[in-house]
Amino acid sequence: THHRSSAASDVYKRQFHNVYSGNSYFKKLYNTQLSKVDQIVAISNYVKNEISKKYNLDSNKIKVINRGVDVKYFEKPILDSQIENIINKYQIDTSKNIILYPARLTNWKGQIEFLDIFNKMQNDNFLLYFAGDTKNQSYTEKLQNKIQSFNLGHKCKIIGNLPRDDLKTLYYLSSIITSFPLQAEGFGRTISEALIMKKKILAFNYGGVKDQLDKLDDIYKVDPHKYNEIVIKLQNIIKIDKEKFSNISLDSKDYISKTFSKYQMVQSYVDLYEQQSI
């Protein structure tokens, strides 16, 4: 995203949300334009490091302003009536441990690869719900067909895209929130959202998510693409009692609130523009 400061008309900013490979000609052209930019904003330390290497930029020219999470919204208690409504609306079985995989359904988000792992768990006490945008119909059908081929229809389902309130309630009802994308994400806010709600999580420890996992023990982190670690860690995380986890989750929640809040993000942008306009 490009921005031009109205307060300082000669100041140009460029905001990076993620890093993708591209055509070398366009990369060269883009790099030429970046050299003229006064200030570059990256939404995570991962993005900062990647664009610094990819475009051969001075890292001092890149400021990290973490993507913001609506802390107050996710802290707000959920009414019992909302919980009951979601259970009925999506036919949620609360008698089992729910693994929630919140991400739009597309190849690089890694749902099919995780389904392969879930199929090997052979544990009837776990359910798996995929929540996310289903506009990629071919991938959604591929995932649904694989669920059926594994005969997992009774343990796994695609819920699809959810309204914000519904997703928050599903976080609340879930035992573990997961994230295993095939590529590192620029930020990956579902992890911060889950941690604000003091939920157990398990995620690949790379990209923008890595900073969000900073205050958590290694049991909640998986090295990228180390699928053999996932089953063991899921089973161990479930065994952690509420009292032990409450201390871990409180520290992590405080860290997320102070570092990745929407308020902090907005204030950082305001400060940046004010500095440039002096």
Regions found by a protein language model. Name each.
Residues Y46, G68:
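Carbohydrate-associated surface elements
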Residues N161-L162, T169-S174, R189:
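Short alpha-helical donor nucleotide-sugar binding micro-motif in glycosyltransferases
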Residues V69, P102, L127-Q144, G160:
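Glycosyltransferase donor-sugar binding loop
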Residues K200-A203:
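Short hydrophobic beta-strand element within catalytic cores of glycosyltransferases
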Residues K215-N228, N236-K242:
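Conserved acidic donor-binding segment of nucleotide-sugar-dependent glycosyltransferases
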Residues E243-E274:
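A charged, aromatic-enriched C-terminal amphipathic alpha-helix characteristic of glycosyltransferases
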